[in-house]
């Protein structure tokens, strides 16, 4: 992997610059999306071609920056029903292409605004294949992703921030992302593709769910 890669930088964009630095001092320049800020985490990859909202909100990605291999992200927008957790624990997201405008009847908010709402720093315009190959061969590295309007990044500080981050080894992430209190789910709902979930008074089945941790 080259020490510095600049991908798709000639394409005009309404978004601000962004950057990803890895613990081996590799630098990826791109276009920032979502929340403006800086986040450090373990850089992993996901090969799914659908379900990006479910992936980003999946608590198993706590502390990680997700590199999506599928290039077209954002085409179905986001909604209130597809989150996998009440809080999004993912540190950041990386896409190859600029996010697509939503075209789906279930979409309530476009992905960029959803990322802002959940304070997730995002980056587009990267060579995600190169990054995926690196992760495949070397393992998931520590990395820092940053997105600021001025587009001037203190690279040395970002590298130091990355190297100082202890990583995920040995952490009890299940304890971190799990609910702190017991609760009983009393919702009686039906679901249709036109209207989504709706409350109902009809009781068709008795269901028991056991969580073994």
Residue locations for each model-derived region?
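RNA-binding accessory domains that recognize and position tRNA/RNA substrates
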Residues: 2-213
């Amino acid at each position: 992997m080259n020490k510095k890669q600049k991908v798709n930088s000639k394409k005009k964009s309404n978004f601000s610059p962004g950057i990803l630095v890895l613990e081996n001092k590799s630098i990826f320049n791109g276009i920032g999306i979502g929340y403006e800020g800086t986040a450090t985490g373990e850089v992993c990859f996901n090969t799914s071609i659908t379900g990006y909202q479910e992936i980003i909100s999946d608590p198993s990605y706590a502390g990680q920056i997700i590199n999506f291999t599928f290039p077209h992200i954002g085409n179905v927008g986001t909604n209130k029903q597809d989150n996998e957790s009440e809080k999004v624990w993912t540190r950041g997201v990386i896409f190859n292409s600029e996010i697509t405008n939503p075209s789906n009847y279930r979409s309530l908010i476009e992905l960029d605004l959803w990322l802002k709402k959940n304070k997730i720093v995002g980056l587009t315009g990267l060579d995600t294949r190169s990054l995926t190959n690196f992760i495949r061969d070397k393992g998931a590295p520590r990395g820092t992703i940053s997105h600021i309007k001025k587009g001037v990044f203190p690279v040395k500080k970002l590298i130091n921030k990355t190297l100082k981050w202890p990583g995920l080894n040995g952490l009890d992430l299940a304890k971190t992302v799990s609910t702190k209190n017991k609760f009983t789910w009393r919702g009686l709902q039906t679901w249709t593709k036109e209207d989504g979930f709706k409350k109902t008074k009809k009781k068709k089945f008795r269901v028991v769910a056991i969580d073994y941790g």
